[in-house]
Each structure stands twice: as structure tokens, then as C-alpha cells.
């Protein structure tokens, strides 16, 4: 039997439990030492992962025919060593009753099974006893012949291989870093099952990529083959990126490998090699994840927040506004307060639509104070979508060169749905923050920001919003207090007190427009909706139950499009007996346009929806169109705006903005003042 010799060594038992149960955060930390920048040759007990063999919790003997091998071997050994026994099975069977535990079933079938099991064990024990004698008195060749004769003729047993297969054997297997990475990442539970099935100790040494297998001699080769079979389906692909991106990826290859579930490494000056075990995700999905993560690296100017190391939820109040976020691993204790205060950063929580990130909230620092320099002509942009990032242009020149004659496009600070929503990714140097400081996530230089642009199709009549897989708990309820803006503003949002996961009927808040100079009111209603897999559904696949009071109730089916669904909701809330305002029925066409992602395991995508107000201003041969929209992800109203220019304009883009609105005033989170002066 396998002896627990390795367990007697001074090895961290917590590490054993970690990997034996499931690959947890501790296992992910060990993956980091696999990359090339790790220290080699130093064997630390914390770098050893022990997967012990399976041992039954109960020490009592199991009922026959499921007798433990421990009991059978011990009983046979006792019978062989007993001087009163004449080494014959007849004598053994006569004494079975005296040795058999009371807990063993004494039925005829169970007794017969016990006799057969004991017979084999007894023969093996006698064989071991004979082998000791032959080892002393005979040569190895003579011993082998005698053992084979005993087994084949006298004991009626046929063997396959060495007769000493039950002896303990140790095998060292050396893996490459790539194989060790996938072994720890995806196959810890499989390795645990292998060790339990074959009663083998498996010791993983992360320091030198070595695996030690301690098991019965006949099982060592089997365990080694099963472990090697894990790496038969590895595939690799090389992608071309810019040198700027390659540098970011190379510096953060370990964290990116963990998050993308693939081995990421630099293969050239501007090439990245991706190795994956197919079955998890395709190369295209990994590339999309990698791009999203790199954007986060660039925006935060910090290492990517490790989801496995996120600790308790924190909150603090700044400028009369309360921020909730999860403390990342690089801010320990209370140092995050000092860090925020020194950097004048607020914590603006944002979520990417990438599947790998929906479980956690990522924190993006956003400067509180805007830039003061009003030299609008100093705005320059660089196209980060192209490999050559050295050339920069004035924003107005870039607009004309990239989008040609009549231009209609969107800006956004969010990196969500990059392939669907954005065609260009830009960085701009702002002498004057056209988009306001709360609009963009800055890095080291508060006057330099990255944003995303998409050429807008004429067929699109509404804005896009951000899609997420879950309703985030940090969503806030904001109100625009300016009456002028509210006159044309109609929105349906989730109220802030409706976000607890324990609530079955979250609230919907209706902001009614102003009529004849008076605010008609703000009403709060309840939505009753179905639940699926423990998540609240905002837009279910089948139907939505709308409830205003205990007596007013309506079910709206979602069997057409999202637009039709929203129109039904608006018409239900806009009935004359409710609002006394016929204008609300016509306002449903101004709701934001959404499209759900096709998925079999998710049932809702829309985070919030609201009406937007559009303003048109024309000067000479040019005109500008801009829209006010509220995005709860960044606590900023001006997360999207639209600019429309014509090529034969007698004034440039900056002169138009300066002359009409004097630049966009920044949005103060302290008092939520008006967006447009």
C-alpha cells in the first residue's frame, strides 16, 4: 500500500487543501511563477502542491463485498504469520469466523465474496513470504522461475508483468512552463481525481516545473500517461499588434494569461503568441478579451485588478457624493484614501460587457478637477487603431480626413462592445477639455485621454447604450434638476433602492415632463418580473409583468423586438387616467434603441433606457447636433454626444463650439448642475 511518506514532510497543508478541492486564488498565484521572469532553482515549501490519495473518512471496515484492501491485507498477513496456521486455505477458512469483524455482513453471498477476496490476499502474502526466502537462498533468475511456477501452477493465478507490482514506486516528470500553466489552470480537479482513483500521491513543484508521482509500481505509468494526455490538444496562434500594445501585453503577460485562460507571450517585436487548450474558447474570443484588458491597463495606468484578490467592498464620500467600489489588490489597508486624496481621483465604477468581467466591478480612476486651459485649437488626436501611432492631427483635420465629406459620428469613453460599436480608437491631447474631465478616464497626464469613435449610419435614429450581463449593485439613481432640460426629458430607470438582490419587485421611476411651466410630478411604480437562475431579469425572453398598484396590473409579452417592448411599457405608463398628459404617448419614439445579444444562457442585457434630447445649431454652412444622455455607469450625463459637420464649412469645428456654447461645462457630481449652459 502507498505510504504517506510525503505527508510527513514540512509542507504547507493549506496549499494541499486548496488544490485538492479546486484551483483557487492560491493556485492562480502559483501560475505567475511559471513565466520566464520567475526565480528558478529555489525550492520553497510554499511552491509545492500536494494532492494526496483518497482516504475514507471512517476508519470502520466497510461491509462486504466492498471490503477495504487495508482490512484484507492485514487479515491475510496475520494469518500467514500465525504459527498455529499450517499455511493451507482449509485452515484459513476454519479460522475466518474468529477473525471476521462483527460489522461484516454474514449473508451467503457476502461470505463467499469475503472468502474469495481473502484467498487472493492470502496467496499474495505467502508469495511475499516465499520471495524473502528465495532472495536469500537463490539467484534472481531462479527466484523468478519459482515465483512464476507458484503463481501459474500451485496458486492458479496469472500475472501480467512484474509480480511485485504492489511495491511502492516514485516517478519524476518534468513539464515545460506551458504544460505546467494549463495543468494548474484547468486540470487541477482532474488531477485530483486521477490521484484518488489510483491511490497516488502527486507532488507539483511550481519552482522547477516538476511533478513527482508516488504510487504502486503498476499505477505510476498509468498516472503519468493520464497527466500527459492533458496537453494533447494545445493550439497556438500568433497575432500582429502595435509595438505599443505589445509592450503593455509583455509587461502584464502573467495577469493577462490568467484572465484570458490562455498562455500569452511575446514572440516578436510586434507579435503576440497565444496558446490555448481548445474547448474553453476560440482564438477570436481570446483576442477580444485581450484587447479589452489592454484598454483597461492603459486607462487605469495600474496593473489589472485581480478578480480573485478583490476584498471587501469600500465606500467613501467626496464632494457630497458617495462612491462604492471593491478595494483592488494594489491598495492595501487605508492607503487607498490617501491615494485618492493625493491624486484628486474619484472612483468611477464601470463594467465591460466581456463575459469574463461581468462577475466583478472594475474601478477606473477619473480626475475630479477639469483642465482650465481654454485653448481649443490645441486638441490633437492619434489613431491608436493603426500600427503607426507617431503621427498626430488636429481633431478637425482628422474628422475630415477619416470620414470625408458629411460626417456623423459618436464619441464615447467606454471600451464596451468594441467590435460592434467602435470603428476607431483615438487618443487626444486636450488643451481644453471639450468633453469635460468627468467624461474621460485619464492616466498620468490629466490633459491626455483615450476615447472611441464610430461613424454613425443614417439608418440609426437612436443612440446606443451599454449592455451588461447583470444589474450591477452600484447603479445610482440620478435626477436632472434643471427644469429647462427636463422639459424635453423623459426617462424610465431603476430606482436606487430597487437594486438589492433580495427584492423581487424593483421600482421603476417615471420623470414626467413639465407642462405650462410646472413640473407635473415624479411617480414611482413597481415592476414585477420573472427570475431565472438566481438573477433578476430586466427584459425577459417571455413576458414582463407591470404593476402600478395592487389593483393595476398588466403583462407585456416580449415576443417581438425590444423597441416594441419599450413602446408597450411607455404606453402603459402613459395612459390618460395616469398622467393626464397626451404628450407622453408621442414621446415613446425617443427612447433609446437597443438590441439584445443572442445567448442561450442569459435572458437580459439592457441596463437602463431613457429618452434623449437633441439640439441643432446652424452657423453659415455648418451645423452641430449634440445630444444629452445619462449613463449610470460613469455618473456622468455627457457620456455620449454627436457632432455633425459639412466639408464646405466656413468655420472649423472648434470655432463653432466656442461661438455657440463656449465649450461644454464640466458636470459637477456635488450638485448635479445643468449640462448645457
From Swiss-Prot:
Gene Ontology cellular component terms for the protein in this record: mitochondrial inner membrane; mitochondrial nucleoid; mitochondrion
UniProt subcellular location: Mitochondrion inner membrane
Domain of life: Eukaryota
The keyword Protein biosynthesis belongs to this UniProt entry's keyword annotation: yes
Annotated organelle transit peptide span: 1-41
One GO BP annotation of this record: mitochondrial translation
This protein's UniProt keywords: Membrane, Mitochondrion, Mitochondrion inner membrane, Protein biosynthesis, Transit peptide
Entry coiled-coil feature ranges: none
Family matches, as Pfam families: KH_SLS1_1, SLS1_C, SLS1_N
Disruption phenotype: Decreases protein level of mitochondrial translation factor mtf2. Protein cox1 absent. Abolishes growth on the respiratory carbon source glycerol.
GO molecular function: translation regulator activity
Keyword Membrane included in the entry's annotation: yes
Function: Translation activation factor that as part of the MRH5C complex specifically recruits cox1 mRNA to the mitochondrial ribosome for translation initiation.
Subunit structure: Component of the MRH5C complex, composed of mrh5, ppr4, mtf2, and sls1. Proteins mtf2 and sls1 form a subcomplex that serves as a scaffold to bring mrh5 and ppr4 together. The MRH5C complex associates with the small subunit of the mitochondrial ribosome.
Family the entry assigns: Belongs to the SLS1 family.
Protein name as it appears in the record: Mitochondrial translation factor sls1
Lineage: Eukaryota, Fungi, Dikarya, Ascomycota, Taphrinomycotina
Gene: sls1
